[in-house]
């Protein structure tokens, strides 16, 4: 199995992005399965385009995108991506679409196709906090999550895609009081445990992961 894992470059005034830094720490093979790593730009359109080019080149079985969700307390595995760009801030090239469709011919939303609950449980088995998330936001992370799901639906039906959000690093919150963080090695270990669950589970497990609000 080939697993393509992407991480974003820094954005929003940050000097580092734990997404790409944690992806870089992943081994080149997990349980005998090839791990292919790629950095993508925090730019509407170009982020998806770069991934599409890599997919065409390496033909992965799984695509896992990783992004920073500063303020979240744990590793969050996304359930759904929605067909809207509504950017609160500009991307790294100054784009700021508001209430625009990601894919004109796409559905309003896609349920992502990774075993999200198995991933969460395997991360937690390593004593790392994790949960299912029901929103990837409306910035670049959701843009990529939806874009990859749409590529799967329209071009690569046997490919599985999904998205993992991670917290800030400790050095990013020195001037952000009461903001959660997680060290880089722990994030990288969580990603490895998530990937193990993807390898081991063609179907998701039946455990609760929902929220009341």
Curated annotation (Swiss-Prot):
Database matches in Gene3D superfamilies: Peptidase C15, pyroglutamyl peptidase I-like
GO biological process: proteolysis
Active-site residues per Swiss-Prot or TrEMBL entry: 78, 141, 165
Record-level GO cellular component terms: cytosol
The reaction(s) this protein catalyses: Release of an N-terminal pyroglutamyl group from a polypeptide, the second amino acid generally not being Pro
SUPFAM superfamilies found in the cross-reference section: Pyrrolidone carboxyl peptidase (pyroglutamate aminopeptidase)
GO molecular function (one): pyroglutamyl-peptidase activity
Cellular localisation: Cytoplasm
Enzyme class, broadest EC rank: hydrolase
EC number: 3.4.19.3
Pfam family, one: Peptidase_C15
Key words, A-Z: Cytoplasm, Hydrolase, Protease, Thiol protease
UniProt-listed InterPro entries: Peptidase_C15 (IPR000816), Peptidase_C15-like (IPR016125), Peptidase_C15-like_sf (IPR036440), PGP-I_bact-type (IPR029762), PGPEP1_Cys_AS (IPR033694), PGPEP1_Glu_AS (IPR033693)
Purpose of the protein: Removes 5-oxoproline from various penultimate amino acid residues except L-proline.
Homology family: Belongs to the peptidase C15 family.
Subunit structure: Homotetramer.
HAMAP family cross-referenced by the UniProt entry: Pyrrolid_peptidase
Protein name stated in the entry: Pyrrolidone-carboxylate peptidase
